[in-house]
Every structure is written in structure tokens, then in C-alpha cells.
């Protein structure tokens, strides 16, 4: 892959730690050296990203299924932000700032003239263990009101909250109240561990860095990391928090990539530009934050602002998604890569295509050759 033109590798630290990746990093460095390449090693921090929990095996979700949402215990003390951010985030997370999304009147039969709601309401509240369970961070629970949408795995799976129930159980003479949340599957699919989760419209403020992020940053330099990618950047204080952690680790020379994945990042892009070494247009979660038909326009707006400021930017997500299972890309995919380069992208990156795909070498071949074709067109 290096011999074909690959310039580096990205590790997603939502699934593995740097300390666990020593063998893989060593193989990458040896392969690059054989090809005369000085490789980039980018690491994607966990940051404020929301993800589902770890499960022993994938869960098949079918349209119309009812699933139960349960919690991943949130260890608030294991998360870290800079002092000013910590106070601000705590204030924003209070219930008074929760943006409620009204339930749609005809969703699951709520309202007159629809009997489905009353039947579902009786059927939802069964004994624990009778539903497929999806784990979400508990900080999402105040937002799980009927009508709230939940998008999983970059929007491939679409749920809608239909019921919130409370069980009262007696334990040692004391009553314990347990809240349970139920959702209807609108678009099904195969859900695996640690997939992205989004609640469109909900204002959720997880901490900028987790304890795991800080541990990874501490050893980033000795592991040969050249760039840190901060997900879901909301404002420049997120980037300053990461910079502070890099300084404390003696790793100020590691480049900082700001991932634009929500509308906060889009709106505040001008303020983010001076604080980041490179902007990442991360179209997976960004495509959950806007209508998909608006995503190309948002991508172009970000590209224009980066060009005007002289700031390099990267385009990622589904560049060659069909090649996870096909040895040949679609015409639309090569067109996408071509126009990303023509719009001024300094770099492009594939993810699942090489991480879990069947044709990683062919992915790099098509990507590199398409980039070279675009560069040739630019210079014509």
C-alpha cells in the first residue's frame, strides 16, 4: 500500500489504546521504511463523541422492532477538561439547558385515530431481558423523550424513542426506581460494538477529553504519533484543551487536526482555524447533523473558508465505501475524490475501506490514481 502511494495510517482510539498498538505501529513503520516513505501516524481521540457500548456479538435490528436502551455508566471523574471548560460544560449540562424535542403527533399512534400507540404502550413495558438492548452513555438519558431520533453507525441505523417507563422494585425494604427507555427501529441493520451515536437536535455536552485520551497523549510522542485528531470540535476552547494536554506531555510538535462533525464546528469555523493545524471535514457524523442533501454544500463552504485562510483541510468518510465489498469503485466515488482534490483538499482519508474491507490494496490504488488524475487536471 505504501508502494502505491499511501502516506500514513490513522488509529481510531475509540477501539484500541496506543499502548496496545505497538506491534501494529511497528509493522507500519517497517513497511514504510522498505518503500522509502516517512509515514504519518494520526490518532483519533475519543473526545466528546457519543458511542454505543461494547457487545459480545453483533445485533441484527429489523424495521419495526422495539429495542430497549440502557446505560453505559459514565465515569465523570475519569474525564478531563481545562478549568474554564469544565465549569462551562457543567453549566450547559444542567437540565435547564436541555433542548426538548416535541414528539410528533402521529409517531407510534400518539393522538386520536391511531390504535397502535395504546397497544404499543401496553406491550413495551415487559420484564427486563425481553428486548434487544442498545447501550448509550447515561448522559443522553435526559434527552430520550418520545419523538427523539437516535442515529447509530453514521446514520445507517435509525431509531425513534417511543416510550419512557419506570419500574419500582423493592430492595431490602427500600423502593428503587428504574427508568427504562424504548425505541422503534425505523431503519434497521447490523449493530456492532462501539458505533457512533447521534441525537439530532439535542444539546449534549460531553467533556473534551477522557482519561483514556490523556493517557494516549502522554505516550503519543514516544509511539511516533505525528498528528492528533480531535473529534466533534465545538469551539476553540476544545482545541486549547488538547493543546494544553500536548504541552504537558512535551508533545507540542504533534500536529492538531480539528474534526468538523457538528453545526457548532461549522458555525465557529473562523475561530477554529487559527488554533488547528488542519481541518477535517468528517462527513459521517456531519451528515447526521444536517440533511444529507445539504452536506455537499456544507463541505464546500468549509473548503472555501479553509482556502481563504490558507488552512489545509482533509476530506474523509465513504470516499470509496463500496470497495469494502467490491474490487471496483462506483463512478460517483471516483468523482467525489476528484472534486475533493479540485476543491483544494490537502489530504483525503479512507476508513472502513481499509480497516475492515476486502480489498484494501485496490482501495489505495484507486484513491492514489484518482488523486493524481485530479492533480494533473489542476496543472493543465
Residue ranges and their predicted role:
Residues 1-110, 117-380:
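Non-catalytic helical/linker scaffolds that mediate oligomerization, partner binding
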Amino acid at each position: 500500500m505504501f508502494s502505491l502511494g499511501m502516506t500514513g495510517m490513522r488509529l481510531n482510539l475509540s477501539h484500541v489504546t496506543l499502548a496496545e498498538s505497538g506491534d501494529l505501529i511497528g509493522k507500519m513503520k517497517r513497511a514504510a521504511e522498505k518503500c522509502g516513505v516517512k509515514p504519518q501516524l494520526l490518532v483519533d481521540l475519543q473526545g466528546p463523541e457519543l458511542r454505543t457500548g461494547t457487545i459480545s456479538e453483533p445485533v441484527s435490528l429489523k424495521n419495526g422492532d422495539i429495542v430497549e436502551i440502557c446505560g453505559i455508566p459514565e465515569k465523570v471523574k475519569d474525564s478531563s477538561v481545562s478549568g474554564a471548560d469544565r465549569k462551562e460544560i457543567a453549566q450547559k449540562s444542567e437540565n435547564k439547558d436541555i433542548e426538548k424535542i416535541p414528539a410528533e403527533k402521529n409517531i407510534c399512534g400518539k393522538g386520536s385515530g391511531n390504535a397502535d400507540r395504546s397497544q404499543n404502550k401496553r406491550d413495551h413495558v415487559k420484564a427486563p431481558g425481553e428486548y434487544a438492548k442498545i447501550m448509550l452513555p447515561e448522559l443522553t438519558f435526559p434527552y430520550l423523550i418520545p419523538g427523539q431520533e437516535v442515529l447509530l453507525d453514521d446514520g445507517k441505523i435509525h431509531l425513534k424513542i417511543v416510550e419512557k417507563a419506570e419500574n419500582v422494585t423493592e430492595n431490602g425494604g427500600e423502593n428503587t426506581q428504574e427508568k427504562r427507555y424504548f425505541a422503534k427501529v425505523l431503519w434497521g441493520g447490523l449493530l456492532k460494538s462501539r458505533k457512533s451515536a447521534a441525537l439530532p437536535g439535542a444539546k449534549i455536552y460531553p467533556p473534551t477529553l477522557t482519561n483514556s485520551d490523556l493517557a494516549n497523549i502522554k505516550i503519543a510522542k514516544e509511539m511516533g504519533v505525528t498528528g492528533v485528531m480531535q473529534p466533534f470540535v465545538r469551539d476553540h476552547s476544545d482545541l486549547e484543551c488538547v493543546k494544553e494536554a500536548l504541552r504537558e506531555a512535551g508533545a507540542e510538535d504533534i500536529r492538531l487536526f480539528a474534526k468538523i462533525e457538528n453545526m457548532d464546528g461549522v458555525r465557529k469555523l473562523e475561530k477554529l482555524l487559527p488554533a488547528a493545524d488542519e481541518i477535517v471535514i468528517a462527513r459521517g457524523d456531519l451528515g447526521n447533523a444536517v440533511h444529507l442533501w445539504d452536506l455537499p454544500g456544507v463541505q464546500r463552504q468549509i473548503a472555501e473558508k479553509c482556502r481563504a485562510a490558507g488552512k489545509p483541510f482533509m476530506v474523509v468518510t465513504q470516499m470509496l465505501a463500496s470497495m469494502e465489498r467490491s474490487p471496483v469503485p462506483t463512478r460517483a466515488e471516483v468523482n467525489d475524490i476528484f472534486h475533493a482534490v479540485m476543491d483544494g483538499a490537502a489530504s483525503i482519508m479512507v476508513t472502513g475501506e481499509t480497516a475492515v474491507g476486502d480489498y484494501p490494496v485496490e482501495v489505495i490504488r484507486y484513491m492514489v490514481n484518482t488523486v493524481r488524475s485530479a492533480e494533473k487536471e489542476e496543472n493543465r
